[in-house]
């Protein structure tokens, strides 16, 4: 999943852009930032859940 996100980021940064050499539009950058924030929030939630799971297993 991370590779797909990296690919999207590369596309937005112009590494693998298929259209002309136009710079990324501001809406592209806005959605890129939004995707990054959602990804970071998901990772944080998974980290917190993993810690809760560890605590539960320690109690058993």
From Swiss-Prot:
Subcellular location: Secreted
Family: Belongs to the sauvagine/corticotropin-releasing factor/urotensin I family.
Record SMART domains: CRF
This protein's UniProt keywords: Amidation, Cleavage on pair of basic residues, Hormone, Secreted
Region (Disordered): 1-22
Species of provenance: Platichthys flesus
Protein name: UI
InterPro entries: Corticotropin-releasing_fac_CS (IPR018446), CRF (IPR000187), Urocortin_CRF (IPR003620)
One GO MF term attached to the UniProt entry: hormone activity
GO cellular component terms listed in the entry, alphabetical order: extracellular region
Biased composition, class Low complexity, residue ranges: 1-14
Bilayer-spanning residue ranges: none
UniProt keyword Secreted present: yes
Valine amide PTM positions: 60
Signal peptide: none
Pfam family, one: CRF
Role, per record: Urotensin is found in the teleost caudal neurosecretory system. It has a suggested role in osmoregulation and as a corticotropin-releasing factor. The non-hormonal portion of this precursor may be a urotensin binding protein, urophysin.
